[in-house]
Structures are given as C-alpha cells and as structure tokens.
C-alpha cells in the first residue's frame, strides 16, 4: 500500500499504486526537471519516494535541526543539495536476502582496463612512499569503471534489485537536475544518524576482504581473519571520530567494536559510537558532527587536509557525489545520513546507458598495490553484479 504523506502537486500522476506507477512518476519528474530520491533504510521493509518540483537547492549551512523534512545530498568536496519533501510516498515491500546466488559469484563480462590498472597501482605505490616519508598516515584513493550497455535502463527496477540483494545496506536512487545524472547506491556506512528518542549514532567502517573463499563458499563474519594492515586502517577511522568528539568536548559516548560485518559480497570491520543527546540536552549534535566528520578518514585519509591535496593530485576523475553523503532528514524527527559508497552514476541518451562505478581503498604503510587494486574490483562488483546481470 502506498501512503501519501505530504501534498502532491496537481501536475503529477494522481494514481500511484505500483512500481510501474512509481516508474511513471520518476520519468514525469525528470521530464519536468524536478529533483527526487527513492530510498530504503537498512533492514527496513518500507521504501520512500520524495519529489521536489523545484529541483532542490544548494545550502550554505548545516543546521539540521532547523531543516524541514527532506533529503540531503553532499558531494565529496563542496556545498550540499537539499530536496524538500513536497511529495513523499511510502510503501511496504517484501524483501528476500540473496545469499549464495549469482549476485555473489565473480563476474566475467567486465573487461579490465590495463591503463587504469597501471595508473592506480602506480599512485598506490607513490602513496606508500609518501606515508613512509611521514607526509600523512593514511590516504584513500579511488578509481572508476565505465560500462556501456544498450537498451532502456529502469532506475526503479535497478533500485528494487539492489534492495533485494543488499537488505542490510542503505539503498537509494537519486536525481538532481543541476547534476544531470542519476545516481544509485547500496552503502553499508552510516555517517550521522539520530532517532526520535535522541540517540545519535555514527560508525567507523574500514578494512575489506571478500566474503567468498577460493572454493566459492561464503565466509561467515565470525570466521574472518584480519591482517594488521586492515586492523590499523580501521583504527585510524576510530581515532578520527574520537578526535572529532574531543573538539566539542564530548566525553559521554558509548563505543562498541570492532566487529566483522557482511556487506554484500564483502566483509568489513565496524565500530559503532552512540550518544544520548536528550540526556545531554545536545540536539544540535548531528549538524555539528556532520561538519566535523565529513570527509572522514574512511574515505579521505589522515591528516585530512594533506590527504585531500594528495587525492586531487593522484586521481584523474572527479569524485562528484561518490564518498559524499546522502539521506533523509527530519522525517518523523529522525536523521539518517550515509556515506555514498558502492555507488554508480548513470547517464542515458539515444537508447544507450553509460554507467560509471566508483570504488576506493585505504592506503597505509603496509599496503600492497595489487591487493588494493583487487579490493576496488570487488567493490565495483557490488553494483555490477546487479545492474549488468
């Protein structure tokens, strides 16, 4: 059942009772140059469709507690966009986790670009030298994979497939006219979250290994083994979050972890931090910490400014919305913002579709360039398995 939560402009289709109708609404809004987002929160059986007929606006401040209900989107570097919830639909969905299926098998139809391979491993090697020289402790380098395929591409069908494949992720489809592309993500990483009871939450997510062993069997989280490099990489993110807490003299927090979690075809190390903002009378915490945390050590590096400068030098592509953040704010007095990982930018024209996948990895002194390359391959496959099958 679909519930109309807010007013729907008369220019939009009035009968919305199925995925097909949501598809019509998506196409109509895109034609009218409106902004929109469709999402499903982790482990949720509800999906939402938000429309802003103005196309959204850029923001100069992040006073989250003063925002109306809407959807916030920020690039890696730059001002965020805000989509106001002029129209907000909610629908219950049936979810089934896909385990041991084709979504977890290696892809054979994605050609490896040797030039990209050489460029990426070269800059990983250069990054290791910089770390050994003491210029920074950690840096996150990313790359892209571009794939073209013919025929019509259904954003909402892809969204539904991602929801089914990755029930523990935040799954989102997004369109902002000023950006001109559609974005899809299935991200495991919470950046800033606060529920209606005032419990604030953020996580440190880093360290990556395949969830599939050489025999094709799934590795359970409790059986994962982590190298010193991966443990240290995740520890950098934990220390970064705690340093942000110290900057605002926040001492009353709970830290749980690290523990191994399954995110699609990958395993990660995760530590969770929670704060009771009602007890502390600190309702402004989400907005304050959002400004301090982003971009985190998990998608940038340590120290932050040195890492950002190195990324600009090493990466040939613009990250755009990759490694930024996105999510609904002030819907039911809750905030859910996630790091935009496991993401793809989709451009359609003349019956063809071009998908640009983004993936990155944390480089430390103990990194191996070829292993880091393979990590990005696995991360790209998170979405490739769904969109290209």
Which residue ranges define each predicted feature?
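Short Lys/Arg-enriched alpha/beta "domain-start" segment
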Residues: 2-54, 149, 156
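Non-catalytic accessory segments adjacent to catalytic cores
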Residues: 43-154, 248-251
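Contiguous alpha-helical scaffold segments within structured protein domains
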Residues: 93-118, 124, 144-149, 203, ...
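Conserved hydrophobic core element of enzyme catalytic domains
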Residues: 284-389
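A glycine-rich phosphate-binding loop feature that marks nucleotide/adenosyl-phosphate handling sites
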Residues: 175-182, 241-242, 258-266, 325-328
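An anion-binding catalytic pocket shared by soluble metabolic enzymes
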Residues: 31-37, 41-44, 148-233, 252, ...
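Conserved hydrophobic/aromatic pocket- or pore-lining residues that grip, position, or stack substrates
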Residues: 134, 192, 239
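A short glycine-rich, hydrophobically flanked beta-strand micro-motif that places a catalytic Asp/Glu
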Residues: 139, 170-175, 319-327
